[in-house]
Amino acid sequence: MMLEPSIDSLQKRIKSKYSLVTLSARRARQLSETNQPLVEKSKSHKFVGMALEEIEAGKLYIEN
C-alpha cells in the first residue's frame, strides 16, 4: 500500500520530519474544528491526510 502524499514529496517542502509532524498535527486539529480545507478536492477524508495534502500543495509552510 502506497501512502499519498509520499514522505519524499513532503520533505521537499518541509525538510525536518519533526516539523512536518508538528505542522500537520496542528493543521489537522484546526481542520477538525473548522472543516475548511485549503485544497479544493482532497483525496483523504481524514484531517491528517488533508493537512498533508495541503503541505504538498504548498498551501502550508513553516516560516523561518
From Swiss-Prot:
Record keywords, A-Z: DNA-directed RNA polymerase, Nucleotidyltransferase, Transcription, Transferase
SUPFAM superfamilies registered for this protein in UniProt: RPB6/omega subunit-like (SSF63562)
Reaction(s) this enzyme catalyzes, per UniProt: RNA(n) + a ribonucleoside 5'-triphosphate = RNA(n+1) + diphosphate
A GO cellular component annotation in the UniProt record: DNA-directed RNA polymerase complex
GO MF term list: DNA binding; DNA-directed RNA polymerase activity
Pfam families: RNA_pol_Rpb6
InterPro entries, sorted: DNA-dir_RNA_pol_omega, Pol_omega/Rpo6/RPB6, RPB6/omega-like_sf
Role noted for this protein: Promotes RNA polymerase assembly. Latches the N- and C-terminal regions of the beta' subunit thereby facilitating its interaction with the beta and alpha subunits.
UniProt xrefs under NCBIfam families: rpoZ
Quaternary context: The RNAP catalytic core consists of 2 alpha, 1 beta, 1 beta' and 1 omega subunit. When a sigma factor is associated with the core the holoenzyme is formed, which can initiate transcription.
Name this polypeptide is given: DNA-directed RNA polymerase subunit omega
Taxonomic source organism: Oceanobacillus iheyensis (strain DSM 14371 / CIP 107618 / JCM 11309 / KCTC 3954 / HTE831)
